[in-house]
């Protein structure tokens, strides 16, 4: 069967070709146009339409580099289906190196958006109408917030079978069961019946090269599982373990924080994970973990007030934690921090 052209924003992309599509989004104060830039790879055979997007939060840079590297490796002549890559969704936040839009709204709480709403609502509406509704599958790339690092992980509603299959194919050490939040892209995709997985890795405004390499390989693994690319999944693979809950360990005392555990480490209930100390004295206070699990998120600021979040711990059922711990070890061996 002859493969048809793909149409996006009134532009037709022929089978076996790559095309840059710029969708007018808004204008800056000085009348400079702002576009949503999508790179489209339209394969020679019919198949799924995969949307890969990054920087819905404008300061989350790892996903942008994942997209850039992915674009350098994709060949539409070897592709079944269509890949739509949007490296920067929140163009306003990216320019300002900010998570948010100029009006301090979170774009990932504005979906599905409105043509006549506030800026965030309008941008969400444009992204939805132009790109989301053209996709059959979505991979949304994120990082931790400023001064917080995340262990590479997939967040997904594990009750969605198609999305769970994508999550397992991606190949992170941990899959975290996570329900959708109102106004998020995940919530919109769920309403539209589009399976979506969210990749969390690294810290805002920083490149984490292990996370970037794992992201590129993970997207390609998903494409292979969807029969968009030929070949087997990367040998650098783990069988992810699902954590159905996670919780933050919070500081109980004001002062300087001296961590005793690191990202990806398995910890036991009652284990000392940090100590706080008064900067004017020698009083040490131990912070003990109320959970048994794996550290999947960590605060990088060694100063904290009472109640501030320090460590995010994924919790597992039964013997799964041993499997998850092995996955972390395999992952660390497979991906290094070298830029290339």
Regions found by a protein language model. Give the residues of each.
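Structured catalytic-domain cores with a bias toward divalent-metal coordination
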Residues: 1-340
């Amino acid at each position: 069967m002859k493969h048809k052209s793909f149409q996006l924003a009134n532009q037709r992309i022929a089978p076996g070709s790559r095309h840059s599509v710029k969708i007018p989004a808004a204008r800056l104060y000085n009348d400079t146009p702002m576009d949503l830039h999508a790179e489209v790879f339209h394969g020679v055979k019919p198949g799924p339409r995969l949307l890969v997007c990054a920087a819905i939060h404008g300061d989350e840079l790892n996903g942008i580099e994942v997209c850039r590297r992915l674009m350098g490796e994709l060949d539409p002549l070897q592709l079944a289906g269509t890949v739509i890559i949007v490296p920067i969704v929140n163009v306003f936040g990216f320019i300002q190196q900010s998570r948010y839009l100029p009006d301090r709204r979170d774009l990932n709480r504005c979906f599905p958006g409105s043509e006549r709403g506030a800026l965030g609502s309008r941008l969400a509406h444009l992204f939805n109408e132009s790109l989301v509704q053209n996709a059959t599958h979505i991979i949304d790339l994120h990082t931790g917030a400023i001064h917080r690092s995340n262990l590479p992980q997939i967040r997904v509603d594990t009750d969605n079978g198609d999305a769970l299959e994508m999550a397992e194919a991606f190949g992170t050490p941990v899959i975290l069961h996570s329900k959708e939040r109102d106004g998020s892209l995940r919530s919109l995709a769920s309403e539209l019946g589009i399976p979506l997985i969210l990749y969390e890795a690294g810290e805002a405004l920083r490149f984490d090269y292990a996370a970037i390499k794992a992201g590129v390989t993970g997207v390609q693994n998903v494409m292979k599982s969807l029969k968009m690319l030929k070949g087997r999944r990367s040998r650098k693979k783990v069988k992810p373990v699902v954590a159905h809950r996670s919780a933050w360990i919070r500081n109980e005392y004001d002062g300087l924080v001296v961590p005793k555990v690191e990202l990806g480490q398995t910890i036991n209930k009652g284990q000392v994970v940090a100590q706080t100390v008064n900067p004017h004295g020698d009083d040490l206070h131990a912070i003990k973990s109320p959970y048994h699990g794996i550290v999947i998120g960590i605060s990088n600021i060694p100063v904290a007030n009472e109640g501030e979040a320090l460590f995010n711990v994924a919790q597992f059922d039964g013997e799964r934690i041993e499997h998850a711990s092995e996955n972390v070890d395999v992952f660390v061996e497979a991906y290094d921090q070298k830029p290339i």
